[in-house]
Amino acid sequence: MMCMIIRRNRFTGVHDQNLIFNVKSTDVNCLV
């Protein structure tokens, strides 16, 4: 699992088949 810290004011919070998670509170992008 890879996690990248990014700066985003926009909250996506989507989990697709690609399993991409965008969290605004922690500003972390996680790719599984």
From Swiss-Prot:
Keywords: Early protein
Superkingdom to which the source organism belongs: Viruses
Protein name: Uncharacterized protein pNG7
Natural source organism: African swine fever virus (strain Badajoz 1971 Vero-adapted)
Induction: Expressed in the early phase of the viral replicative cycle.
Name of encoding gene: pNG7
